């Protein structure tokens, strides 16, 4: 398998340019589809411009957007940015968090008060962007070291990431996407919202998130952007149903997994089921994508090859370092942390990784998760967790320091088949860190995760 020429993608420098190009080229195409009906790009534009008229008094100010519905989010986000406001994105209950952390949002928009209707329509192109390096979006992020942060992104950050991403990973106007990721997450905002709309694709929305799988065959998506945990569940449902078409509607050809690492075993299993599951790597601080596996140039278990908008290198201690036009402007209200993470224009991700001879990036762990034993040896638990999941019937694995036993580890395993516990124990016995593991615990329920499928390593033990 060899790399190939980039896909073509028009250059855009600002959200304004992206939006106006989109509605001009795809006016009569369907932008959003619900079970109750569809909304075309021209209809979306009418709603956005009316809403933008209501946003004019807030020009230059912060506006918090805690909207979950995709169409309402589109109206709120585009009207906010087009009007020259700074969109602050988060879950609905993050508004107070932002304000208490030094935020100065003058307006809070939720699903119940999105501006829509006939008031105050703004003419197309009434506002332009004089400085594409100006901050247009602030995202709530866990931060590279786990502490919640507010990431400031500019027009140039976001647009360079979209364009570079579309040159490596194919999205087409004929594609049908199916939403489950909140758009207040960077992966959702860029990969599942802005990029699909930029190419004129259709975004379908289930009646409820809980109906995502049961309604999938109704909408017949061609592509998904989901966390690995969702990809794993999809593979399971396909196995139970006996065919991918019975679950997906028969048109799903590929999945892009972000937010957490995609295990090689899951990619292989889905490919055997007729779906190309590809992993990528990113951080909110990088707008968010850093690397991606291409449609016809990929390595299972890898994070893909770097996008053209950034340079990726590995530091002396194995840390992944990034420099590029997609790297954030900084953390809002935290100059000290910004200076610590961004040194000389280089983002210190806190992730450990390596780049192979073909240019593929592999993420091997987190610096903060490395366990240092009393004899000076070190362990990256993510490496062993991935091995356990890949080579046994364990659905999920978590290795961490055990209670009351300094420098002794415990392995917590989620496995749905209790009869496989002895087999999993035997595999763990053969690992080179087995002598460090004092206990292997099993659970019949999935390990707690955040909304993008990352296991919460420090949750309270049950």
What are these regions, as identified by a protein language model?
Residues 37-38, 52-93, 180:
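Conserved AMP-binding/adenylate-forming
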Residues 222-226, 235-298:
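Gly/Ser/Thr-rich phosphate-binding loop
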Residues 9-11, 15, 28-57, 70, ...:
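Conserved AMP-binding/adenylate-forming core of the ANL superfamily
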Residues 10-13, 27-28, 122-140, 147, ...:
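Conserved pre-ATP/AMP-binding loop-to-beta segment of ANL
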Residues 324, 330, 352-435:
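AMP-binding/adenylate-forming catalytic core of the ANL superfamily
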Residues 159-176, 183-243:
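Conserved AMP-binding/adenylation subdomain of ANL enzymes
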Residues 40-41, 136-160:
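Conserved AMP-binding A3 loop
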Residues 302-308, 315-341, 360, 375-379:
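Conserved ATP/PPi-binding loop(s) of AMP-dependent carboxylate-activating enzymes
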